[in-house]
């Protein structure tokens, strides 16, 4: 059969070229699967990479940090420490609260961890105090993860205790039931209660003490089972008036009889409705509020969870009185949606730019249509695989697709360009398609699998970073694979039926001008290529110098972990002197809020003070600042934070720590700043000595700002020294003394009022409004022998001391967490090195262990693995190329293009003022896969010319460079323009995308300029080396054969 017959050639594409209906239906199936997958994909900011985290909170009002540590935290820690798969355990014990955070291995399902935690709590129950008012409560939530939704409930007409009651019963419970919600907390703490404030002098005058009041109320307000009885025909349930539900009932309660006359509770105490905890407060801007913070479960979908909550808000608002208002203060999904929409726009822009490049190079609208169909088809088809893999539409997967827009068109371009070349020579479209597709099939396979090989190491990255980029790598690999399938099936089929013979094509002026332009460029390139090939040593010097320059740039470029995002939210911690009172702290918080609201870029400010599960000490307050939308601001969050801190700098005795909220939360405890490290010692006294020394030294380092610690050992403590002998002689036990103190100063929960909707506590405390400071102890009385009233002051002395406000543990040992931010002109690498150098310079003893935490620890792990990751990518690609080419040499020639990309990427980052972070490293790894395409296309054609046409290596590589110049330039421009929207992005989340785009564009420009010359030179160098060793081996074999012949017995036979 004639070679031009359409029935010959075609390789793997042959079947699809000859069966257009089957090919079309196959592509429609891919398209439909992708569309269905896209509609079902969830939306999120980043892939779900959370550690399984559980927080256990135990409240014991009135207990000191020492008591909380020894009788609550320690028993629980011992049980939790036995759980298999526990990665890290931290705890914070403060006045009245114990918070333990358990972080599990990524491989452990959260539900399994939950069961183990519940079992551990049950095992520790017998060791916990009997009068613990609340059992330990666990939540499947990361405390460092900022709320996904913050609501403020306010009222000008109703008291906050009434508003809190409505919020608890009508709103918080309903929100908690939404799937994906991990924890709903109410900041402001105005839960209704009955407060009994006894007059110490009055009860002493009647020969009573506080314990009498407590036991009387406990015995008078009960609610227990009473049974039932059956009559002849009916059953009767028993009930009594055993519960006291009204204030008047408590006021009229008889405490004792003296001289036959009743002493009622109102005679010795003030009874009123109030808040269960008077030392909690929250404000929305400057208005008192109940603030609802909604946190998600680790791994939950933020968008779905928030949408479900928003859908029920109208119903919840309607359930409240008209005098009560509920407003949304923050919604993290607003910026997540905006960020995803920006990336989607950039994806469409990348596709448009790529199509434009194709048209400029191909000069044919019909030819341009073919790869233009391949791009969306490959990308849309990827959504189906993403859905089956459980991925989401997020910044990283959309970035992968945006980059893929430049990749996936490469295969189609190479196929079309090769087929068009045969059509230009006079071949019919069908014959050209079969011949061109058959010739280029192996190249497409080489390009595809070598590029996917680069992504393989990303799949084996460990821990959080590996989880983070797994979706990115698989999404990109799938898009590339689908692209190869489309390029070997649909593209040649469409070429065979849509492209016209050269004689039938009429080019317009633009197309003719572009053709002349490229012919001129190719002619210029050919002239320069001859010079380079004739003087190879200069080019080789440039090639090897780029390798050295890449290493130098890598060592000198600042290194970071993850780009700082501007999501329009700022988390803050306000720290005051450790001995500050609640009222004084409240004044400070309101003063700071008023100053912050004066900033033109601040939308609203939410603040909270007091001790509960989310805040550990009274001298620290939490802030959440919502900024105006990015398009309404002139500056970004990293410039706003110093300005806000400067605004409050003149407020005396307070320090404001601020950090922007990030989508990627690796930390597992609420911190003052972005980065943390922990000092851990077996002896607390060692930490007392070295923590202040290290903190003071770190404050002097220019690389660090906002250096702080959670070491709070300067709180005021009233130490009561009891004369045990005298107390024993008077018949007073230590239990009685502790109870008297707890009754007076502990806001003691002594009873509970049960209703069908809620439960309300009865709180006992001493009325100290007319007593200042330490004088309040003078009115504490006890009952001794013969029911005599004994003042506490007769058996004890009170001494003011300094003590701990909170006690922190890491893995059950005392620990202190240092917090810091990185100075604007410094990098995270420089900051970490500064911490290490400072520790060495002050002579930190070896028995104090330093551990970096959260993002800082992840940065160190990532930094240590960077070179291994790049090396693994290179080795993976070498193995794949070696298998494809059945050669040890040709893969080295192809990989010689890599240093040029590294130089371009690193130079672009340094010029742009960017750090080498995780995103940039991913960009460099992708460049490794892209730039080798140029070499593959050259070497494939050179080897074919040597093998099939008998050309010399010089002529073969020269002709290959000229023939493949246009597709090389076209594919590079397509990849470059695909990355350009990322480099130029300015919207929300642009901080994530820009480093990737800069790496890609910088690396592609540099590699395009250099590899067009270095690759053919290195090809010829290795060819000469191969021939040299081949000749040397042949000469050695010939010499060996000659020696064997010389020593053969035939040559030594005697003549006859």
Swiss-Prot record:
Source superkingdom: Bacteria
Region (Disordered), start-end ranges: 1037-1056
Subunit and partners: Part of a tripartite efflux system composed of MdtA, MdtB and MdtC. MdtB forms a heteromultimer with MdtC.
Similarity remark: Belongs to the resistance-nodulation-cell division (RND) (TC 2.A.6) family. MdtB subfamily.
Family annotation (Gene3D superfamilies): Multidrug efflux transporter AcrB pore domain, Multidrug efflux transporter AcrB pore domain like, Multidrug efflux transporter AcrB TolC docking domain, DN and DC subdomains, Multidrug efflux transporter AcrB transmembrane domain
Membrane topology term: Multi-pass membrane protein
InterPro entries (UniProt xref): AcrB_DN_DC_subdom, Acrflvin-R, Multidrug-R_MdtB
Main localization category: membrane
Disulfide bonds, paired cysteine numbers: none
GO cellular component terms, semicolon-separated: plasma membrane
SUPFAM superfamilies: Multidrug efflux transporter AcrB pore domain, PN1, PN2, PC1 and PC2 subdomains, Multidrug efflux transporter AcrB TolC docking domain, DN and DC subdomains, Multidrug efflux transporter AcrB transmembrane domain
Residues that span the membrane, as ranges: 16-36, 342-362, 373-393, 396-416, 440-460, 472-492, 537-557, 869-889, 890-910, 911-931, 968-988, 1002-1022
Name of the protein described by the UniProt record: Multidrug resistance protein MdtB
Subcellular location as annotated: Cell inner membrane
Record's keyword terms, sorted: Cell inner membrane, Cell membrane, Membrane, Transmembrane, Transmembrane helix, Transport
Biased composition (Basic and acidic residues): 1043-1056
GO molecular function: xenobiotic transmembrane transporter activity
Pfam families per UniProt: ACR_tran
């Amino acid at each position: 059969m004639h070679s031009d017959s359409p029935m010959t050639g075609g390789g793997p594409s042959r079947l699809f070229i000859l069966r257009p209906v089957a090919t079309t239906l196959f592509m429609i199936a891919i398209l439909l699967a992708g569309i269905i997958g896209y509609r079902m994909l969830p939306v999120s900011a980043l892939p779900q990479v959370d550690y399984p985290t559980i927080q256990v909170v135990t409240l014991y009002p009135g207990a000191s940090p020492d008591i909380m540590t020894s009788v609550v935290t320690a028993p629980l820690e011992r049980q939790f420490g036995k759980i298999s798969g526990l990665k890290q355990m931290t705890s914070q014990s403060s006045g009245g609260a114990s918070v333990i955070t358990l972080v599990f291995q990524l491989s452990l399902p959260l539900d399994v961890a939950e069961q183990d935690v519940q079992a551990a709590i049950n095992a520790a129950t017998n060791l916990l105090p009997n009068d613990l008012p609340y059992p330990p409560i666990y939540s499947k939530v990361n405390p460092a993860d900022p709320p996904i939704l913050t609501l403020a409930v306010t009222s000008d007409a109703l008291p906050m205790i009434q508003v809190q009651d409505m919020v608890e019963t009508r709103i918080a419970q309903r929100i908690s039931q939404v799937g994906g919600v991990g924890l709903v907390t109410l900041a402001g703490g105005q839960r209704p209660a009955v407060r009994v404030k006894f007059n110490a002098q009055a009860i002493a005058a009647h020969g009573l003490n506080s314990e009498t009041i407590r036991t009387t109320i406990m015995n008078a307000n009960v609610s227990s089972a009473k049974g039932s009885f059956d009559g002849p025909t009916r059953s009767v349930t028993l009930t009594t008036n055993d519960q006291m539900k009204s204030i008047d009932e408590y006021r009229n309660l008889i405490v004792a009889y003296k001289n036959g006359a009743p002493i009622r509770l109102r005679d010795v105490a003030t009874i009123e409705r109030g808040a269960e905890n008077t030392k909690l407060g929250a404000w929305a801007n400057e208005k008192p509020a109940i603030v609802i913070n909604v946190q998600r479960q680790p791994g939950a979908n933020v968008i779905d969870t928030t949408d479900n909550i928003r859908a029920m808000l109208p119903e919840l608002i309607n359930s409240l009185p008209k005098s009560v208002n509920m407003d949304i203060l923050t919604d993290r999904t607003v910026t997540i949606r905006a960020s995803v929409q920006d990336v989607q726009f950039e994806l469409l822009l990348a596709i448009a730019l790529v199509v434009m490049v194709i048209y400029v190079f191909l000069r044919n609208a019909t030819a341009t249509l073919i790869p233009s169909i391949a791009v969306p088809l490959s990308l849309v088809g990827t959504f189906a695989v993403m859905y089956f893999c459980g991925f989401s539409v997020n910044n990283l997967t959309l970035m992968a697709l945006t980059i893929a827009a430049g990749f996936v068109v490469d295969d189609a371009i190479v196929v079309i360009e090769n087929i068009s070349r045969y059509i230009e020579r006079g071949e019919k479209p069908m014959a050209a398609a079969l011949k061109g597709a058959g010739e280029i099939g192996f190249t497409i396979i080489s390009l595809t699998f070598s590029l996917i090989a680069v992504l393989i190491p990303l799949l084996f990255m460990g821990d959080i970073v590996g989880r983070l980029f797994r979706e990115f790598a698989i999404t990109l690999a799938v898009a590339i694979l689908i692209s190869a399938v489309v390029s070997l099936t649909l593209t040649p089929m469409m070429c065979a039926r849509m492209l016209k013979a050269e004689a039938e094509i009429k080019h317009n002026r633009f197309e003719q001008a572009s053709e002349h332009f490229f012919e001129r460029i190719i002619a210029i390139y050919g002239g320069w290529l001859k010079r380079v090939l004739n003087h190879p040593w200069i080019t080789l010097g440039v090639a090897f110098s780029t390798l050295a320059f890449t290493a130098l740039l890598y060592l000198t470029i600042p290194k970071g972990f993850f780009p700082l995002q501007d999501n329009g939210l700022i988390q803050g911690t306000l720290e005051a002197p450790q001995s500050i009172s609640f009222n004084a702290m409240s004044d400070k918080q309101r003063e700071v809020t008023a100053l912050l609201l004066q900033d033109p870029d601040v939308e609203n400010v939410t603040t909270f003070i007091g001790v509960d599960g989310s805040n550990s000490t009274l001298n620290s307050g939490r802030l959440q600042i919502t900024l105006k939308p990015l398009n309404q601001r002139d500056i970004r969050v990293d410039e706003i934070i110093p300005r806000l801190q400067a605004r409050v700098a003149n407020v005396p005795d307070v320090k404001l720590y601020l950090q922007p909220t990030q989508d990627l939360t690796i930390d597992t405890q609420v911190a003052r700043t972005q980065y943390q490290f922990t000092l851990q010692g077996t002896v607390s006294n060692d930490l007392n000595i070295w923590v202040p020394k290290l903190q003071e030294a770190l404050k002097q380092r220019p690389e660090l700002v906002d250096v702080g610690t959670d070491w709070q050992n300067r709180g005021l403590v009233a130490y009561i020294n009891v004369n045990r002998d005298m107390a024993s002689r008077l018949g007073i036990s230590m239990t009685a003394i502790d109870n008297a103190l707890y009754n007076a100063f502990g806001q003691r929960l002594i009873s509970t009022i049960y209703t069908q909707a809620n439960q309300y506590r009865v709180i006992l405390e001493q009325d100290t409004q007319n007593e200042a400071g330490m004088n309040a102890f003078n009115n504490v009385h006890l009952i001794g022998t013969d029911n005599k009233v004994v003042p506490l002051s007769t058996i004890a002395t009170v001494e003011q001391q300094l003590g701990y406000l909170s006690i922190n543990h890491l893995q059950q040992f005392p620990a202190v967490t240092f917090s810091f931010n990185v100075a604007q002109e410094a990098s995270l690498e420089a900051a970490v090195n500064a911490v290490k150098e400072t520790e060495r310079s002050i002579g930190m003893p070896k028995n104090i262990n330093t551990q970096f935490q959260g993002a800082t620890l992840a940065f160190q792990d990532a930094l240590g693995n960077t070179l291994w990751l790049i090396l693994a990518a290179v080795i993976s690609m070498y193995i794949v190329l070696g298998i494809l080419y059945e050669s040890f040499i040709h893969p080295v020639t192809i990989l010689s293009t890599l240093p040029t990309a590294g130089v371009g990427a690193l130079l672009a980052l340094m010029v742009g003022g960017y750090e080498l972070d995780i995103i940039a490293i991913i960009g460099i790894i992708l460049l490794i896969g892209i730039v080798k395409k140029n070499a593959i296309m050259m070497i494939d054609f050179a080897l074919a010319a040597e093998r099939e046409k008998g050309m010399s290596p010089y002529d073969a590589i020269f002709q290959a460079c000229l023939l493949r110049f246009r597709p090389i330039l076209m594919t590079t421009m397509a990849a470059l323009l695909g990355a350009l929207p990322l480099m130029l992005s300015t919207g929300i989340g642009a901080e994530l995308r820009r480093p990737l785009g800069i790496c890609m564009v910088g690396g592609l420009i540099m590699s395009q300029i250099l590899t067009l010359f270095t690759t053919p030179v290195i090809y010829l160098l290795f060819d000469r080396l191969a021939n040299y060793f081949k000749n040397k081996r042949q000469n050695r074999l010939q010499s060996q054969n000659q020696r064997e012949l010389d020593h053969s017995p035939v040559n030594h036979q005697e003549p006859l």
